[in-house]
C-alpha cells in the first residue's frame, strides 16, 4: 500500500499504520514544520518528504492507495474565530473550483484553514489515477455552515466517479 499523508506533523499516520500492522510500501509525507520533519526522519527514515502541500503533484508519485490528513483548523474551531475559509478580501470560499480560480488569480487567503481545499485538490487528482483510493480527513467540531461546506465538497468528490 502506498500512503500520502498531508499535514503529516511528526508522522502520527505512520505510527498508527505500524501499530495496526498495516504494511506500507511507500509513505509520502507533506509537512513544512522543520522540527516535525526532523522527528519523522529520526523515527521513520524511509518516509519520502514532499514539502508543502501547495507543491504536491500526485502525477509524480506512485499510485496512492490511502490519503490521510487533517488540514489546519484554527478558523473552523470553536476555540478560534470560526470564520472558516476566506480570502484577505473577506470572500468566503465554498467550492474547490472557486478556490482554484482565486488561487490562479493570485488571491491571498486568511489563516491556514483554506488548505482544506488543497486536500480536496489532491484527493481529486489521486482519484484520476486510482478511483478506489481510500481517504481519511480529520478535522475539528465546527459550526454548521462550514461543516456543510466540507461535507458537500467530499460528497461531490465521491459522487463524481
Positions of PLM-derived features:
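Conserved active-site and SAM-binding loop architecture
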Residues: 1-161
Amino acid at each position: 500500500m502506498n500512503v500520502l499523508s498531508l499535514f503529516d506533523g511528526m508522522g502520527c499516520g505512520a505510527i498508527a499504520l505500524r501499530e495496526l500492522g498495516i504494511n506500507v510500501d511507500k509513505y509520502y509525507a507533506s509537512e513544512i514544520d522543520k522540527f516535525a520533519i526532523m522527528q519523522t526522519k529520526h523515527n521513520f527514515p524511509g518516509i519520502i518528504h514532499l514539502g508543502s502541500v501547495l507543491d504536491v503533484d500526485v502525477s509524480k508519485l506512485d499510485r496512492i492507495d490511502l490519503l490521510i490528513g487533517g488540514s489546519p483548523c484554527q478558523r473552523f474551531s470553536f476555540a478560534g474565530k470560526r470564520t472558516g475559509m476566506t480570502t484577505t478580501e473577506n470572500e468566503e470560499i465554498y467550492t474547490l473550483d472557486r478556490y482554484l480560480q482565486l488561487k490562479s488569480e493570485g488571491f491571498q487567503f486568511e489563516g491556514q484553514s483554506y488548505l482544506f481545499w488543497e486536500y480536496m485538490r489532491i484527493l481529486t487528482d489521486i482519484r484520476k489515477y486510482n478511483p478506489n483510493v481510500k481517504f481519511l480527513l480529520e478535522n475539528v467540531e465546527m459550526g454548521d455552515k462550514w461543516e456543510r461546506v466540507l461535507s458537500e465538497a467530499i460528497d461531490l468528490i465521491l459522487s463524481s466517479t
